[in-house]
Amino acid sequence: MKQPFSRLFGFGDKQDQEMETGKQEEVHQLPIKEIVPNRFQPRTIFDDERIEELAQTIRTHGIIQPIVVRQREGKYEIIAGERRFRAVTLLGWETIPAIIKEFNDSQTASVALIENLQREGLTAVEEAVAYQKLIELHGLTQESLAQRLGKGQSTIANKLRLLHLSEPVQQAIMERKISERHARALLSLKDDALETKLLEEIVEQHLNVKQTEERVKELLEDAPASKPKKKPTRKAYSKDMRIAMNTIRQSVDMVMKSGLKVDTAEEEHEDFYQFTIRIPKKK
């Protein structure tokens, strides 16, 4: 039998046991003014029209599923159900049915991320941010995260690569001004200024994906060729030394092929050979 997401991420045993024994969780009517949004909410843009539609449904049928919250700093922080909370707020209700959980930050973030990943409507960047946070929270690799979510590893990797794009491009994706395929074409530029320049063209001229790919090719061809670095004259090194140096170079090449921007430099000294690798903190 397929395991629930909560158990796959290591915090669902207690809740699953309660469900199996038929134990009903108590539903509380909490004051709207005492409830605050989830700090770990991956969804940054809410569709006002859809919230209004949900509000009308709730007005007619009521709330079928209570929201889930936890107590934090004298308030109730939403774990799951922010759209319902927004809809009820729009209706002007004073209370909302809720289940109170004892979750820590890691559990709260995981539930919020997973709940949103299971729903449609997240932008590609919001989805990528959710994947990245789950990887960081649970110390996962891309492959292990893909297995837990039932997705292909390439799907996870392609989404995460979008986080290497410049801020204006990521914002354009979240505002749905460009598609994910447009954004993936821009990845080849590996230059914030060029990405922003082409982003403006895409939006203003309504370029499709094929046209965008052609413009990327043109920009790369027009870019001034970088001057080849002067290779230092190397002394004869031992076999072990050569293996170590080549291993480092191959590792750097693999990282760069994944889409991460890495600056490297090699310096030869009298008593040692120095590799300097700089990886920008900005994702």
UniProtKB/Swiss-Prot annotation:
One of its GO terms (molecular function) is DNA binding. Keywords: Cell cycle, Cell division, Cytoplasm, DNA-binding, Septation. It is found in: Cytoplasm, Nucleoid. The keyword Transmembrane does not apply. Residues 1-26 are annotated as: Disordered. It comes from the Bacteria. Residues 143-162 bind DNA. One of its GO terms (biological process) is positive regulation of sporulation resulting in formation of a cellular spore. Residues 13-26 have a biased composition (Basic and acidic residues). NCBIfam families: nucleoid_noc (TIGR04285), parB_part (TIGR00180). Effects nucleoid occlusion by binding relatively nonspecifically to DNA and preventing the assembly of the division machinery in the vicinity of the nucleoid, especially under conditions that disturb the cell cycle. It helps to coordinate cell division and chromosome segregation by preventing the formation of the Z ring through the nucleoid, which would cause chromosome breakage. Belongs to the ParB family. PANTHER family: CHROMOSOME-PARTITIONING PROTEIN PARB-RELATED (PTHR33375), NUCLEOID OCCLUSION PROTEIN (PTHR33375:SF8). This is Nucleoid occlusion protein. The lineage of its organism: Bacteria, Bacillati, Bacillota, Bacilli, Bacillales.
